[in-house]
Design a protein with these regions (language model features):
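Hydrophobic alpha-helical transmembrane segments in multi-pass integral membrane proteins
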Residues: 51-61, 109-124, 160-177, 219-236, ...
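Membrane-interface interhelical linkers
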Residues: 1-19, 26-72, 82-92, 141-152, ...
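Hydrophobic transmembrane alpha-helices of multi-pass small-molecule transport proteins
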Residues: 46, 51, 107-111, 120-140, ...
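Alpha-helical transmembrane segments of MFS and MFS-like solute carriers/permeases
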Residues: 12-15, 70-73, 77, 130, ...
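C-terminal appended segment following the main domain
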Residues: 229-281
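Specific alpha-helical transmembrane segments that line the substrate/conduction pathway
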Residues: 71-79, 86-132, 180-186, 235-255
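Hydrophobic/small/kink-forming positions within alpha-helical transmembrane segments
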Residues: 17, 21, 25, 49-52, ...
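Residue-level recognition of transmembrane alpha-helices
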Residues: 17, 40-44, 98-102, 124, ...
Length: 281
């Protein structure tokens, strides 16, 4: 029973991998057809409706003041980061965009957690390294040399994701549903303001609305289970395992968009799979 409980945080994190990976695949597709900030705002609306309804139906207790503030800060950072990430993906220069955002987003919280909660152990560290290598190899492409156009946005997105992880962890053991709902409200406020003041508001075709709605449901689902993983386990474990989401994005792109699956990506998949038991154990 104890062994089963030990793997529950990892199970939550890997569920987030599936949800976030699928959401980012849809985000990359949808953000090519409409302004990235507008698309992200629609994603946030969809997610907020779902998580808000769940929180109300389950009667989950509303967070205290401290948890509420941290949730709002996390949502603001995460909302901007997601919009920048979608815009970077939509730029078409993905050679470094996805791995930079994912690895940077995981590395910063991992370092902070090591100082705050202590050294995680050599086995976990080896798993972190393998996961980082795996994410990089899975996400990178062979195309192009020089500096990709989306690199700066990818760096900012990675820093924003790191800030989201760290702040959402500070919300403590408050209801994951309400923490997710509050953070998503802040994310919508930020991205919605950018859309309105930046004059990005446009009519959106029904298929794109559908893509954004599904992406929003998947994204908020990943956020909820990530919050639970970080609440019952170490933040660095939850962040590093969850950062493997590009593997799902790449597999979906291979299946539906027939993108090339290189030898480097295969090696990255193996490294990522090998990292899971090291981090979870």
């Amino acid at each position: 029973m104890a062994m089963t409980a030990q793997y529950i945080p990892a199970a939550y994190s890997l569920t987030a991998v599936g949800a976030w990976g699928a959401s980012d695949f849809l985000g990359g597709v949808g953000a090519r057809r409409v302004n990235a900030f507008l698309f992200t705002a629609i994603v946030h609306i969809s997610g907020l409706v779902v998580v808000g309804a769940l929180a109300l139906m389950t009667g989950a207790p509303f967070p205290g003041n401290a948890s509420l503030v941290w949730s709002l800060i996390a949502g603001s950072l995460g909302g901007i980061a997601l919009a920048l990430f979608y815009r970077a993906l939509a730029s078409g220069n993905m050679g470094l965009v996805a791995p930079v955002a994912a690895v940077l987003g995981a590395a910063i919280p991992t370092i902070v957690t090591a100082f705050a909660e202590g050294f995680p152990g050599y086995r976990h560290v080896l798993g972190f390294i393998l996961a980082g290598i795996g994410v990089w190899l899975i996400s990178r492409t062979e195309a192009g040399v020089g500096r990709p156009k989306g690199l700066g946005m990818a760096v900012l997105a990675g820093i924003g994701f790191a800030g989201f992880y760290l702040c959402i962890h500070q919300a403590g053991n408050a209801s994951a549903l309400w923490v997710a709902a509050c953070s998503r409200s802040a994310a919508l406020l930020v991205t919605g303001s950018i859309v309105l003041f930046g004059r990005h508001l446009r009519a959106v075709a029904a298929p794109v609305l559908g893509i954004a709605a599904v992406a929003g449901i998947l994204d908020i689902s990943g956020t909820i289970v990530f919050i639970r993983a970080s609440q019952i386990g170490r933040l660095d474990d939850a962040v590093v395992l969850s950062s493997l989401y590009p593997a799902v994005t790449v597999v979906l792109a291979r299946i539906f968009l027939h993108e090339h699956f290189s030898r480097a990506r295969t090696i990255g998949m193996v490294a990522a799979l090998a990292a899971v038991p090291m981090i979870a154990g």
